[in-house]
């Protein structure tokens, strides 16, 4: 068995069966079953779902959507990613799989917006996301240039 990696998930019934393993593990708002079923019905080949397989089973997943800021009152201008529904099966939590998914998204080098769910604020803080509060609610943002500057400063020290 090779080292697990992040991959784009296919929109098919096998993935739908894999998603059923996550049902009941987390909060209802993390459920992706309906979203995946809608994509199967629409025959959408451009999957927004990413995951990590380990031992042939899906153990972690997230949704990534490319967006453009259309006047929303927050600090991202232009194109950015919305990271939704990051979830790792209980037996695989605290082993770096959630961080692998986020680092995959960071590697695309777009700003990222996400909403912290279920006591996960510390996770986003650890990954250099900044909290943002607006009248509609709170969320976290990561900027590629902030991360690149931090690496450059560390390398020069």
Curated annotation (Swiss-Prot):
<dbReference type="Pfam" id="PF00583">
    <property type="entry name" value="Acetyltransf_1"/>
</dbReference>
<dbReference type="InterPro" id="IPR017274">
    <property type="entry name" value="YlbP"/>
</dbReference>
<protein>
    <recommendedName>
        <fullName>Uncharacterized N-acetyltransferase BA_4060/GBAA_4060/BAS3772</fullName>
        <ecNumber>2.3.1.-</ecNumber>
    </recommendedName>
</protein>
<keyword id="KW-0012">Acyltransferase</keyword>
<dbReference type="InterPro" id="IPR016181">
    <property type="entry name" value="Acyl_CoA_acyltransferase"/>
</dbReference>
<keyword id="KW-0808">Transferase</keyword>
<feature type="domain" description="N-acetyltransferase">
    <location>
        <begin position="9"/>
        <end position="146"/>
    </location>
</feature>
<dbReference type="InterPro" id="IPR000182">
    <property type="entry name" value="GNAT_dom"/>
</dbReference>
<dbReference type="GO" id="GO:0016747">
    <property type="term" value="F:acyltransferase activity, transferring groups other than amino-acyl groups"/>
</dbReference>
């Amino acid at each position: 068995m090779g080292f697990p990696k992040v991959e784009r998930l296919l929109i098919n019934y096998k993935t739908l069966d894999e998603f059923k393993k996550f049902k009941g593990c987390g909060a209802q708002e993390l459920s992706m079953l309906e979203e995946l079923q809608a994509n199967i019905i629409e025959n959408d080949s451009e999957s927004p779902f990413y995951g990590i397989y380990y031992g042939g089973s899906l153990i972690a997943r997230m949704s990534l959507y490319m967006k453009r800021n259309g006047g929303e009152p927050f600090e991202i201008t232009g194109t950015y990613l919305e990271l939704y529904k990051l979830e790792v099966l209980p037996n695989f939590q605290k082993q770096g799989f959630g961080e692998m998914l986020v680092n995959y998204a960071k590697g695309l080098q777009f700003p990222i917006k996400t909403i912290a769910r279920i006591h996960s604020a510390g996770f986003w803080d650890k990954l250099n996301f900044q909290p943002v509060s607006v009248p509609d609610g709170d969320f976290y943002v990561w900027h590629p240039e902030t991360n690149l500057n931090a690496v450059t400063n560390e390398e020069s020290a």
